[in-house]
Amino acid sequence: MTSKLDQLKKFTTVVADTGDFGAIKSLEPEDATTNPSLLLKAASDANNAKMLGEAFDGSKGDIGLACDRFAVAIGQEILKVVPGRVSTEVDARLSFDTNALIERSERLIGLYDAAGIKRDRVLIKLAATWEGIRAAEKLEKDGIQTNLTLLFSFAQAVACAEAGVFLISPFVGRIYDWYKKSTGTDYTGAEDPGVQSVTRIYNYYKANDFKTVVMGASFRNLNQIEQLAGCDRLTISTDLLKKLAEDTGTLERKLTPDKAGEKRSDTVKNLTESQFRWASNEDAMATEKLAEGIRQFARDQEKLEALLSAKKA
């Protein structure tokens, strides 16, 4: 019998959301994504101690550079076991500084360049703030492709598409978490607010012929993944990938480009900064989850820096 994972791979590019090389190798995804939380987990793994030490040794005491060197080293190892791309994230504390985001992105891609990794195998991850989207717009024009993450609202998705970013990562599970806590309802199937958000974005992009790739992220259960089967890409934790690999039930495709036009309901165009900020202000869930996500990644970045700083002693 064919597993649901193999069925999913027929119409969706499957991406592993992990820095675990062994798990990636066994599950055979096309791409992989990392973030500060996953890098912190990798840095705490004794198997990566040598890599962590080398990142510090080559940084001349610059802890921020050491973190970037470690992120790129993890990315290099991942690229040995995936045929596609790896996403490497910029320090979340820079999320509201366009110029700083551009500079840090250029440093990351420069480290990949120095390691002999072609740019078409790397996506630079930025939080989908207004400043992050503007940075991505500039980077894309300069040949550096981006992945806009921590995306919780339709306004973020529209702004990203209009900026010509390569890929967005709209979150499913964190949206579900917020609504479940807010309403007390345990949403399932197509009623899941996270599923509805990604479906709306996917349909809008296809109906308007936007080329930006939609990669659903942050899943809490298999049903959320199944409801988005057919999305351009889905980045999935190793635990859920393993469950998909073990399930031999039938998987039905839910999202298709040819049906998207029938469900088009929004025609927002040329979103201005004031419109973007107002839409964000009016969406309590998106405002709270974006801020929370940036804070969480910033704290994990600080913990990673502390690990590297300890090597100075």
UniProtKB/Swiss-Prot annotation:
Subcellular compartments: Cytoplasm
EC number: 2.2.1.2
Keyword tags: Cytoplasm, Pentose shunt, Schiff base, Transferase
GO cellular component: cytosol
UniProt cross-references to InterPro entries, sorted A to Z: Aldolase_TIM, TAL/FSA, Transaldolase_1, Transaldolase_AS
Top EC class for this record: transferase
Pathway it works in: Carbohydrate degradation; pentose phosphate pathway; D-glyceraldehyde 3-phosphate and beta-D-fructose 6-phosphate from D-ribose 5-phosphate and D-xylulose 5-phosphate (non-oxidative stage): step 2/3
Main location: cytoplasm
Superkingdom of origin: Bacteria
Active site feature: 125 (schiff-base intermediate with substrate)
Reactions performed catalytically: D-sedoheptulose 7-phosphate + D-glyceraldehyde 3-phosphate = D-erythrose 4-phosphate + beta-D-fructose 6-phosphate
Any one GO biological process: carbohydrate metabolic process
CDD domains: Transaldolase_TalAB (cd00957)
Gene Ontology molecular function terms on file: transaldolase activity
Keyword Phosphoprotein belongs to the record: no
Quaternary structure and interacting proteins, as annotated: Homodimer.
NCBIfam families per record: PRK12346.1 (NF009001), talAB (TIGR00874)
Annotated family: Belongs to the transaldolase family. Type 1 subfamily.
Known function: Transaldolase is important for the balance of metabolites in the pentose-phosphate pathway.
Name of the protein this chain belongs to: Transaldolase
Native organism: Pseudomonas syringae pv. syringae (strain B728a)
Gene that produces this protein: tal
